[in-house]
Amino acid sequence: IEPERQEEEEEETRQRVRRGQVRQQQQ
């Protein structure tokens, strides 16, 4: 398992959560 890949996955999850929060705020 590459640590770099883990970081990328964490970033993607963070972005998704952030987008979800923004969507909730818009609603």
Curated annotation (Swiss-Prot):
Residues 1-12 have a biased composition (Acidic residues). Metalloproteinase inhibitor, active on a globulinase from L.albus seeds, thermolysin and gelatinase B. Residues 1-27 are annotated as: Disordered. GO terms for molecular function: peptidase inhibitor activity. Keywords: Metalloenzyme inhibitor, Metalloprotease inhibitor, Protease inhibitor. It comes from Lupinus albus. This is Metalloproteinase inhibitor 1.
